[in-house]
């Protein structure tokens, strides 16, 4: 009995999307006899790699991190923005036990509910729709005092665009009949991440003491005064919002504070100022004992406070499932995409699983990859072919970075050269897989090189696309392709080709049915 394994190989051609139109399309311009032949003669289909199908907002372009997480997880993995959008749409947000408990504690004690966050439609650190939903939640649970502390954007949105958002919040408060905007300040102060604690202190004092450099009777008036001082949204100085006869919105013991940013990096510092007992960033004039301080997502593992949406741990990703079944696997790529075939493909797990080997090929040391479009693909292919021939691995996951890394340069001829280099590599890998009696899937994590010019502006298109990506089967099994697939169907497809059971956590479906 032979102990030599017949591997199943997943080759991810990074940034290799599918586009019918040949205009400004480096993939169709390239001479690719091998990929052309495989596409014509082997079972194939197109799969989605962007938008809702990978857990991103509708029509948003895919990216390598999200792509590899979905590839390895075998299920759609919702990004925080989309996860919250879905929760609000399905109304489960309004029953979130952490958010409701915080509001209920404040209501029971007759205290205030404070909401703070980046008040914009930017969708990078937060979204105004989530804040509007939080106001609604607090009002529905009987909160009488609801105070919004609006951090203004101007980075992920145009520099002077906050007025529309502030008007939305004012309208929501009018609709629910309680609460108001209590302060405005630019994200430059409230969301610093470079230990410039003097900035954070200004935001902290504004919220805890209701003291700022300026005061205005309403938020729009405060914003317009800032513009008159030549402060764009990002740099608006601490402004207390308080109409005539309105009570102070200073934070008091027993109040609840909910931080509505979902991205961690710029939320950590001000959160630590509120919750750390041994805080040393600046001398706090007032330390508030909140009934609850809630962070919307986990900003850091060492921040000890309530979290409404803890990170979803991904159980039984492809890598973990292989290890549980005592299978061997190899992850191989160049420096540029090594983290993607390891950490991201494993669902955010840094350590290799038992039986998982890794090979890192150094990417070339050039200023930009248009100067060496083949990158280190020859060495990568040599090592990959060696691994296939070794008979050591049940599964091999490989990423060729060229289509993406050279596509990002915007240099068309270089992208064509990159694609042609890949075709030569695929020829060698295909021969090795067939000689070993193995099987291979060729796909991509997102598009890039198929769209090298922006038709709207005429400028080089250096970003990813939201186009589908190819999926090709190479092997000796008689298989039938299933259309309508997505990246999260790849792991179940690999397991099916290996004759393995698919874990229940994987909701993706096999895209090649063995006949």
UniProtKB/Swiss-Prot annotation:
Pathway: Carbohydrate degradation; glycolysis; pyruvate from D-glyceraldehyde 3-phosphate: step 3/5. Its cofactor is Mn(2+). InterPro entries: Alkaline_phosphatase_core_sf (IPR017850), BPG-indep_PGM_N (IPR011258), Metalloenzyme (IPR006124), PGAM_B_sf (IPR036646), Pgm_bpd_ind (IPR005995). Mn(2+) 1 binds at residues 404, 408, 464. Keywords: Glycolysis, Isomerase, Manganese, Metal-binding. Substrate binds at residues 125, 155-156, 187, 193, 263-266, 337. GO terms for cellular component: cytosol. The active site is at 64 (phosphoserine intermediate). It comes from the Bacteria. Its EC number is 5.4.2.12. Binds 2 manganese ions per subunit. It catalyses: (2R)-2-phosphoglycerate = (2R)-3-phosphoglycerate. Pfam families: iPGM_N, Metalloenzyme. GO terms for molecular function: manganese ion binding; phosphoglycerate mutase activity. Mn(2+) 2 binds at residues 14, 64, 445-446. It is an enzyme of class 5 (isomerase). Monomer. HAMAP family: GpmI (MF_01038). Belongs to the BPG-independent phosphoglycerate mutase family. Catalyzes the interconversion of 2-phosphoglycerate and 3-phosphoglycerate. This is 2,3-bisphosphoglycerate-independent phosphoglycerate mutase. The gene is gpmI.
